[in-house]
A protein has these predicted regions:
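The feature captures the beta-strand-to-loop junction immediately N-terminal to the Walker
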Residues: 35-37
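Conserved structural motif at the start of ABC-family nucleotide-binding domains
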Residues: 5, 19-21, 75
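ABC transporter nucleotide-binding domain
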Residues: 169-253
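Helix-to-loop junction immediately C-terminal to a conserved catalytic motif
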Residues: 50
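Catalytic Walker B motif of ABC-type/P-loop ATPase nucleotide-binding domains
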Residues: 151-155
C-alpha cells in the first residue's frame, strides 16, 4: 500500500500545550479529514508535517521519503492552503500568475485562469481589496494549478458561503479521481468532512483519539435510548459517551448492530455527534 503521508510519534510542546505522539497514515488517492476543537492541535500537526515548526521528536514521510531530508524535492508536488492568505496585498491576479510561473515548473496558467473565473475573482483588484472568502478562493485556485500530488488544507472552506463551499468540495472530489493525488484537510466543519473524507483523524487536547475509515466509523456508531438502569447492560468498552436528560439516557456505542439485536432502540448518527459524544459525553 502506498502512502502520501506517514506521521510517526510527532511531539511538540508549547507553553500550555503539548502535541503527544501523533501518528497516522494517509493512503495515496484518498482524503483524510483532521477534526478537533479550536486549539486541539490540528494546525500544529500540519505545521509539523511541513517542517514549519521545529518538532521535539517524531518522523514525517511524504511520498515515502523523509520530508526533512528531501524537502525541496517534495515541496514541488505539494500545495498548501492555510486559513490566512499569504499573498502580498498589492498583487493582482495577473501578477500572481507571473510569480507562480517562476516558482512551479508545472504551473498551468489556463487552469489557474479557469478557477479564478469560476470563483468570479476580479483580475483588476488588488488582494488587499478581496474579502476573506475571495482570498481563500484565490489560494485554492493557486493550489489546484501546478499539478500537485498532495493538497494540505487548513480550514480552507471556512469563511465561504454554503454554495461556494459545496462547489469547492466537489472540486476536491474531482481532484482525487487521479489515483496519485491525495488530500489532508483540517476543518471544524464536520459536514464538509462527512461529505468528502475517506478517513477521519480526531484530535483532542493534543492527542489523537482515533484515525479511522469514515464510513465504517459512522456505520458502526449508534445512539442507544435507554433508562439509567439499562446502561449496565452495555459493555463499557462499547461506550463512546453518555448523555443524561429528563427522559432517560442516550448512550453512543461503537457497535450499533449488536445492541439493535439485543432489542434496544438505536438511532443512527453522524460525524458531528460522534465528536460531541467523544469529547463531552461523560462515561
Amino acid at each position: 500500500m502506498k502512502y502520501a503521508i506517514e506521521v510517526n510519534n510527532l511531539n511538540k510542546t508549547y507553553d500550555g500545550f503539548t502535541l503527544k505522539d501523533a501518528s497516522f497514515k494517509l493512503e495515496t488517492g484518498t482524503i483524510m479529514g483532521i477534526v478537533g476543537e479550536n486549539g486541539a492541535g490540528k494546525s500544529t500537526i500540519l505545521k509539523g508535517i511541513l517542517n514549519l515548526i521545529n518538532i521535539d521528536s517524531g518522523e514525517v514521510k511524504i511520498f515515502g521519503k523523509d520530508f526533512k531530508e528531501n524537502e525541496m524535492e517534495i515541496k514541488k508536488d505539494i500545495a498548501v492552503v492555510f486559513d490566512e492568505s499569504y499573498f502580498h496585498d498589492n498583487l493582482k491576479i495577473p501578477d500572481i500568475d507571473k510569480i507562480m510561473q517562476n516558482i512551479y515548473p508545472n504551473w498551468n496558467k489556463n487552469q489557474f485562469l479557469k478557477y479564478t473565473n469560476k470563483f468570479k475573482l476580479p483580475k483588476d483588484k488588488r488582494v488587499k481589496d478581496f474579502s476573506r472568502g475571495m482570498k481563500m478562493k484565490l489560494s485554492i485556485a493557486v493550489a489546484l494549478s501546478h499539478e500537485a500530488k498532495l493538497l494540505i488544507l487548513d480550514e480552507a472552506t471556512s469563511g465561504l458561503d454554503p454554495v461556494v463551499r459545496d462547489e469547492i468540495l466537489d472540486i476536491f472530489l474531482d481532484y482525487i479521481q487521479n489515483e496519485d493525488c491525495s488530500i489532508l484537510i483540517a476543518s471544524h466543519i464536520t459536514s464538509d468532512l462527512e461529505k468528502i473524507a475517506d478517513y477521519i483523524t480526531f484530535i483532542n487536547d493534543g492527542q489523537i483519539i482515533f484515525s479511522e475509515n469514515k464510513d465504517e466509523l459512522i456505520y458502526n456508531a449508534g445512539i442507544v435510548k435507554c433508562s439509567e438502569k439499562e446502561i449496565d447492560k452495555i459493555k463499557n468498552e462499547d461506550i463512546v459517551g453518555i448523555r443524561k436528560n429528563t427522559f432517560g439516557c442516550e448512550v453512543m456505542v461503537n457497535n450499533r448492530e449488536h445492541y439493535e439485536n439485543m432489542g434496544f432502540v438505536v438511532d443512527k448518527t453522524n460525524l458531528e455527534e460522534i465528536i460531541l459524544f467523544t469529547v463531552r459525553g461523560a462515561k
